[in-house]
């Protein structure tokens, strides 16, 4: 019986591998191919590789001012993600320990927040009303909320795996609320905090609608807004666009590769308790 099932399982795994390759790997390879092509060859033969040209990267860097925009993106992503992770920790602990009367309702509200659609007009109206339009603090604050629901859900699961006896022991020794969170809870849930931070960072880093709606000053643009300028009503610079995408993606790829071990640890948070 086991031998008869082995072949169908192998075929299914091969099919899944081919499907994953088609859906994820081929688009990446295609963008890389375009980034090293001349505009003329891409327009004449967009599906076949041509001679390798590295000048697309230097042109994209200078024409879109990607150096300044990468610094803006790092600032926006790190600060907004750190704020959403910190606020998520402050919200997650009382939910996990059931210290709030409406903890279940609050947790449900956060869960629903994962599936709410993005609305451009309310975001624009909110930014203008609160003087958060076209400035760095406003752009950062408006990107804290999108990463908050998942941060709360991840941290609630992680905190729930910590024995409640540690809370009682720490408070009997006179430890304050924030002191207990920073000295005891944070070291124990560090992988989950990292995942929440990386998710928030990636969410801000990849945002294209927010910069178009909230920013008009080129000196404030993140890298996605700079790359967006390669689109035109009459002409689009596809090779420079692909080169800009590669440049913008490289820091995130390096970051996730460096944090791979911590990400694997975080995947086990909450699976084993005690």
Language-model region placement:
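A hydrophobic, multi-pass inner-membrane permease signature
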Residues: 1-274
């Amino acid at each position: 019986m086991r031998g008869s099932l082995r072949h169908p399982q192998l075929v299914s795994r091969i099919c899944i591998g081919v499907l994953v390759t088609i859906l994820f790997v081929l688009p990446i390879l295609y963008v890389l191919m375009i980034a090293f092509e001349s505009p003329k060859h891409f327009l004449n033969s967009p599906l076949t590789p041509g001679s390798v040209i590295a000048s697309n990267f230097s042109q994209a860097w200078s024409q879109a001012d990607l150096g300044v925009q990468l610094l803006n993106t790092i600032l926006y992503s790190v600060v907004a993600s750190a704020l959403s992770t910190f606020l998520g920790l402050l919200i997650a602990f009382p939910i996990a320990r059931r210290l709030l009367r409406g903890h279940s309702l609050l947790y449900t509200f956060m869960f629903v927040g994962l599936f709410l659609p993005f609305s451009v007009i309310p975001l624009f109206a909110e930014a203008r009303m609160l003087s958060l339009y076209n400035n760095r603090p406003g752009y950062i604050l408006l990107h804290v909320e999108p990463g908050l629901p998942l941060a709360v859900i991840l941290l609630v699961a992680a905190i729930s795996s910590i024995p409640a006896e540690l809370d009682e022991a720490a408070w009997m020794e006179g430890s304050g609320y924030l002191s207990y969170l920073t000295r005891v809870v944070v070291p124990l849930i560090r992988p989950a905090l990292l995942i929440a931070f990386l998710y928030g960072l990636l969410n801000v880093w990849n945002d294209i609608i927010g910069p178009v709606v909230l920013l008009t000053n080129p000196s404030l643009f993140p890298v996605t807004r700079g790359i967006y300028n390669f689109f035109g009503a009459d002409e689009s610079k596809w090779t420079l666009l692909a080169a800009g995408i590669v440049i913008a993606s490289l820091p995130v790829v390096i970051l996730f590769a460096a944090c791979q071990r911590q990400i694997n640890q975080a995947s086990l948070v909450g699976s084993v308790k005690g």
